[in-house]
Amino acid sequence: MKFSFVSLFPNLMEFYFKDSILARAKEKKLFKLNFYNPRDFSKNSYHKVDDYKIGGGAGLLIQAEPMYEVLRSIQEKKENPYFIFLNPSGKTFNQKDAKRLSKKEHIVFVCGRYEGIDERVLEIFANEVFSIGDFILTGGELPALVMCDAILRNVNGVLGNMESLEEESFENNLFEAPAFSKPFIFEKKNKKFYTPSEFLKGNHARIASLKTTLASCKTKFFRPDLFLEHERKK
């Protein structure tokens, strides 16, 4: 699988893939990375890519020409690029999208800055437009990294234990059950906090049943909307 990032600040993203699970997956050649800077495709001597909006309005906009050129150059490599634009007006990214997109050959994340990208570029290239929530960020780089991370976790071999993926939150519209580590009794300020005793008895069937119950309770408490969706699909 291949990921390309189109950004005015590619250095902000490269570091993310240098440690931990994704670094190991990259070393195993489970995915490839490319970074493109629209400034390199600007036709003016100052590599300027932004200008004021036609019709007025605050802030600067990334112009159509350099964005068109960089995306067209990616298209011409004929690596089945799937263009994803990051925009607050896009649909909210979720775990189902992460699973679906993990089957793509080549995802291109197009990251905006300033007041965004000339709308005509989206009309020409966008396969999908995503947001990661109802809030505004300085640019599309963080949402692109969030999505890339979530997608890669669904690529075979990236996680050392596929069972970890199956047990993660949002599977079957439920959060992952609460997790506990040693010590079995955690004591602070004269208060004792216990691990559920059933977890210590070694009966795997009963532990699995308790985890399902706890996952349901956790989801119902924190995200009743997800819990209702889970109940509806039973």
UniProtKB/Swiss-Prot annotation:
Keywords: Cytoplasm, Methyltransferase, S-adenosyl-L-methionine, Transferase, tRNA processing. One of its GO terms (molecular function) is tRNA (guanine(37)-N1)-methyltransferase activity. S-adenosyl-L-methionine binds at G112, I132, G133, D134, F135, I136, L137. Pfam families: tRNA_m1G_MT. GO terms for biological process: tRNA N1-guanine methylation. NCBIfam families: PRK00026.1, trmD. This is tRNA (guanine-N(1)-)-methyltransferase. It comes from Campylobacter jejuni subsp. doylei (strain ATCC BAA-1458 / RM4099 / 269.97). The lineage of its organism: Bacteria, Pseudomonadati, Campylobacterota, Epsilonproteobacteria, Campylobacterales.
